[in-house]
């Protein structure tokens, strides 16, 4: 079956939902991006495996959770998007201190689930605006916590729909980076946390979210942190020191509240505006400090808007 030959008959035996020419802006926290040629919402992991096994091997694939670490260009994505958020959403307490979580569970939900089960060490996930699949992929963290410090086992799936169980030692884990995944994607993980107190953990989450609201533009469309922190410094400090707070291109604006955030002001920005502002910030910081800011956000898709 060719890529262009994929149609609704492709999911005859599947339980999920296949959409065509689906606008992606509503699936990203920046609220920008053109359409996906196809978007699939799997019913569960087995359904996902079946769907992948029937895809043409050369079909371009994009995995999307909350879309908080992705800039999808205005031309969209000319392949198939696999949506995990709201789909792969199971959380299970396996033992007193071990949780199995699927890739589509939001990090905030995971933080609350662990706290309510009297486990500590996962409160920081409440401050990450993404899914656990994305957190595994980039070793997401904040407030002194990192995702992979709790991982004891992961499940991955490849484009043939084959599922593997893998251990942490099979990966190279670093700051906001995980190597060794190859042509696979995370679909679940077993996480080991420490015994704790529900009330203490829930209060910590409440305090963390209050701090986040005070220091980050949580009431504006954004993707989270745009750049990684360079060794020994902070991206936000460098951007602010270069006088870039409030700088804008179209509806894309460097946040006055936190310089490592670019906001889509009142939903008026295009992906092209945001991408241009990212490059401008990198250029100005490089020129003034000789430091190269590395993007944390992934830029995906076609730059040119196409008629489909």
Curated annotation (Swiss-Prot):
Domain of life: Bacteria
Gene Ontology CC: one annotated term: cytosol
Alphabetical list of PROSITE patterns matching this protein: FAD_PCMH (PS51387)
Domain named FAD-binding PCMH-type: residues: 32-196
Keywords assigned by UniProt, alphabetized: Cell cycle, Cell division, Cell shape, Cell wall biogenesis/degradation, Cytoplasm, FAD, Flavoprotein, NADP, Oxidoreductase, Peptidoglycan synthesis
Top-level EC class as recorded in UniProt: oxidoreductase
Catalytic activity: UDP-N-acetyl-alpha-D-muramate + NADP(+) = UDP-N-acetyl-3-O-(1-carboxyvinyl)-alpha-D-glucosamine + NADPH + H(+)
Gene Ontology terms for molecular function: FAD binding; UDP-N-acetylmuramate dehydrogenase activity
GO biological process, one term: regulation of cell shape
Major subcellular site: cytoplasm
Pathway: Cell wall biogenesis; peptidoglycan biosynthesis
Active site: 176, 225, 296
Places the protein is found: Cytoplasm
Family: Belongs to the MurB family.
Role, per record: Cell wall formation.
Name assigned to this protein: UDP-N-acetylenolpyruvoylglucosamine reductase
Organism (species): Legionella pneumophila (strain Lens)
Taxonomic lineage from the root: Bacteria, Pseudomonadati, Pseudomonadota, Gammaproteobacteria, Legionellales
